[in-house]
Structure formats: structure tokens, C-alpha cells
Amino acid sequence: VVTQDFIEKNGVADQVSTQGGDFTRNDFPQNCDVAVMASNLPQYNREIINQVVQKAFDALLPGGEMHLIGEMLDDDRKGPMDAAIWGLMEVMSNSTGLAHSRKDCVQYFKQAGFENIEVHEFIPDILVRVTGAKPK
């Protein structure tokens, strides 16, 4: 609802649509240009993230992009602290979550079939963005 209000207020409702749901259970809409998963990465284990990234890949049109934004550990898994703390908090709360590394996230994209996979600083030492494109 909030996203749809924002889209309408900015006059792009004829260009952008959203669909609510539980991305771990519900099917994704088909023929999408872009899929975004943001700021909930540590809440889920590797199996769930693999499934979600694969569902996004399957829903995208050829050339479509996925953007995964979240708290990610460096490849050596020694930091940054925010990503480690989020992962620890998930373990302590008995969720399925854990701290994923940048390397883990790139692997999720590769396994799904994405190409042109890139890792970008989104908010330094807090959020990272991994992007990939579905082959044309």
C-alpha cells in the first residue's frame, strides 16, 4: 500500500506496478523488468534465499535485472560489524536467518542463472547491493 501510494504521488503509476505477498511462499508475477529484495536478507537461510533469487530469475523478462540489497559480510566473513550483528540476532531469535557474505549472494545469483553480476556498496559498512541480469 505504501509503495503504491508513493508510485501514484510521483506520477508513474502507468509505468510501475507492485504486488504484495510473501515472497517465500507466493508466486511472483511474470514478465517483470526488475525484481528488488531489500533489507531483509539476514532473516532467511541459504535455502530460502536461493529459492527467492531463483523465483525472481524465473519471473524476469530476458534482460531483466534483480537487485538484492542487504547487510552482507565481507568475503572473509570477519565484518562489517552490522552484518555480523544482524546475523547473530537472527540466530538468537531462533529464526532461519544468518549472516550472508557478498560471495554467498553472488553464488545465489550464479546458481539461478544471472549474468553480469556485480557487487556495489549501497551504504558503506551497512548495506551492499548485488545486481544481475537475466540473459537476453
Summary of predicted features, one role per range:
Residues V1-K136:
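Alpha-helical subdomain
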